Amino acid sequence: MSKSASRARLADIIRARSFGRGEITLASGRKSDFYFNLKPTMLDPEGAALLAELTFEALREDNVDYIGGLEMGAVPLAGAIAQLSWLKNHPIAAFFVRKKPKEHGARLSVEGLSKTETLQGKRVVIVEDVTTTGGSAIKAAESVREAGGVIVLVLTMVDREEGATEAFAAAGLPFRSLYKASEFLKS
């Protein structure tokens, strides 16, 4: 399937499984009359495969070592991309950032690394399913920076176009999206 056909098919899946209209309170606390819940798309076999493929292709030239983001939205996405990257002989390891460190065990903020792995000096992409203000991805980026990682990009599947671009610019974080909310609001 061509990139444009994959993108169109994924948009259809998002529209059918993950986009809705109706009053909702977003993670940012804002109210909205439309929403995206990408978990049904990320956990659908075809949706996961297309998200991984399009994301992997968007990152192929960025020489990325790790991909991850804030739990929960980034977890299935980072895992799917890591698996596909292995199959494409261009491995990108996955991790996730806890919203708050566990109060037992190793008390880690960044999870998924082995005892011998570190993000120190590694090129990292922060992924997110849906971005509104950018707050969640910025929180993940701060944890990665504290662990020594170098953020090369924040990549979201859907940008709600509600201030994230400006927030990422202010935080010194390059930002791209696969889709913009306006693409779904037209239909």
From Swiss-Prot:
Protein name as it appears in the record: Orotate phosphoribosyltransferase
Binding site for 5-phospho-alpha-D-ribose 1-diphosphate: 98-99, 102, 104, 128-136
Chain residues that bind orotate: 132, 160
Pathway recorded for this protein: Pyrimidine metabolism; UMP biosynthesis via de novo pathway; UMP from orotate: step 1/2
Transmembrane regions: none
Cofactor field: Mg(2+)
Listed GO MF terms: magnesium ion binding; orotate phosphoribosyltransferase activity
Quaternary structure annotation from Swiss-Prot or TrEMBL: Homodimer.
BP terms from Gene Ontology: 'de novo' UMP biosynthetic process; pyrimidine nucleobase biosynthetic process
Entries under CDD domains matching the protein: PRTases_typeI
Function, as annotated: Catalyzes the transfer of a ribosyl phosphate group from 5-phosphoribose 1-diphosphate to orotate, leading to the formation of orotidine monophosphate (OMP).
Keywords recorded for this protein, A-Z: Glycosyltransferase, Magnesium, Pyrimidine biosynthesis, Transferase
EC number: 2.4.2.10
Family recorded in the similarity comment: Belongs to the purine/pyrimidine phosphoribosyltransferase family. PyrE subfamily.
Catalytic activities: orotidine 5'-phosphate + diphosphate = orotate + 5-phospho-alpha-D-ribose 1-diphosphate
Family matches, as HAMAP family: PyrE
PANTHER family per record: OROTATE PHOSPHORIBOSYLTRANSFERASE (PTHR19278), URIDINE 5'-MONOPHOSPHATE SYNTHASE (PTHR19278:SF9)
Species annotation: Rhodopseudomonas palustris (strain BisB18)
Superkingdom per UniProt: Bacteria
